[in-house]
From Swiss-Prot:
Protein name in UniProt: Endochitinase 11
Classification of source organism: Eukaryota, Fungi, Dikarya, Ascomycota, Pezizomycotina
Occurrences of domain GH18 (ranges): 235-522
Record's signal peptide: 1-24
The protein's enzyme class: hydrolase
Main subcellular localisation: secreted
Name of encoding gene: chi11
GO molecular function: chitin binding; endochitinase activity
Chemical reaction(s) catalysed: Random endo-hydrolysis of N-acetyl-beta-D-glucosaminide (1->4)-beta-linkages in chitin and chitodextrins
Keyword set, alphabetical order: Carbohydrate metabolism, Chitin degradation, Chitin-binding, Glycoprotein, Glycosidase, Hydrolase, Polysaccharide degradation, Secreted, Signal, Virulence
pH-dependent activity: Optimum pH is 5.0.
Amino acid sequence: MLFSMVMFTERWWVGSKDCPRVPALENSNNPWRLERTATAAELSQYGNPTTCEIDNGGVIVADGFQASKGYTGDSIVDYNDAHYKTSVDQDAWGFVRAAYNRGRNTNRQSSGPHPLCTRKCIAWLLMGRLMNAVLTQSDNPALVPNQNATGSNSRPWKPLGKAQSYSNEELNNAPQFNPETLYASDTLIRFNGVNYISQSKEQKVSPSDSNPWRVFVDWTGTKERVGTPKKAWPKHVYAPYVDFTLNTIPDLRALAKNHNVNHFTLAFVVSKDANTTCGTAYGMQNYAQYSKIKALREAGGDVMLSIGGANNAPLAASCKNVDDLMQHYYDIVDNLNLKVLDFDIEGTWVAVQASIERRNLAVKKVQDKWKSEGKDIAIWYTLPILPTGLTPEGMNVLSDAKAKGVELAGVNVMTMDYGNAICQSANTEGQNIHGKCATSAIAFLHSQLKGLHPNKSDAEIDAMMGTTPMVGVNDVQGEVFYLSDARLVMQDAQKRNLGMVGIWSIARDLPAALTCLRNSTA
């Protein structure tokens, strides 16, 4: 990279905030390595950038929502770190996101589990506190080790705070809803014979009114910028990942023309607060790299998009409202003209139950919406794996998806970074150590998916599997994926007729020194 008349190389992944000042040649905390002074030819070709200001791709800056303020139609506000747009004029103390909570624990309850409380149990009362059944009622919610207060572990019970209980007399005599009354938060009312509790300060909003605020991202002109795919997405495909957050990405059309690589997986869309972005640095509306997608599609190729990844937070973690999350997924597919959508669930997020359930609920909702519109959008989940198969956390992601009715086209696994001694492969070119770890992982994955889908044939299970190794030097020290490993993995994929083969990543598919770990070489 050229910056301020100096050539730098990145030592690891860098984001938009990692501006290459003039660092010391050796600094373990600096992602940039100073190489040399730029030549006159390089300065003539690339110019001499001296600032790190970039086009944010259309990121919206909106004022924070104020409940005491009225809004005109088409107003855009920021609320709980997401943008919302109202379709109609709004009075003060009108809608926020949820005006009333219908019957949430408004009936008198005794301590102890509800007799019908199962895996789908909403809540029950324990010693004056509401508890939510995240997984199952079989574990005692009174025991702290079984509680999941922050949603960051896999325990089954989440405390919801102090319960609100009312006598039958209080419920029956609750004041009838009056649109002219300004209700404080947590006020009990009665509307059409049903009790409700206001979730915020409210006026002129009845429990039956439809909320006019909708999650909002400015997609103006995006559909035209990315072009439209000319062909259906293949049932069996090589779709290497493209790190779409890099300042420079490969020419996708040239790769299609010169190497017959026609399909790619773009990574990653993540949340900045609760809004959709490309790697947090770029907005979704007018991203400069969209022209490469359009050129590829005009040449007959196509892309799928991956949401998540190892860095930053996935949308399912930051966007707490399932309907908003569903709308994000719908808008991404609609405005980028996608036929396939991938969810890369890794790192700590593969074990955060709240985001797992929220994602699966939103995917089910958006799939139902697509079906009602006659659209066939394929959904893939990408998960970390060991040579012995998916981890319990990964299996939980898939089990929860099945329980919620999500229909997966496939499960792609990251056959990389195992952290297992048997996969140490530095200086073992030709022994296929890393390749054997990958094929072992796929064999175990087949058994695991067969257990989840016993009615599918072996061929159908193979067709819904994908393998994505990290070419060259992996993040885990001592793990290297060689060309001989690639041949073994491809042979196994062809034998099984896998649904997908990928690599991380196309930008890294270049030679480098054995110990060199970069996002632009392998």
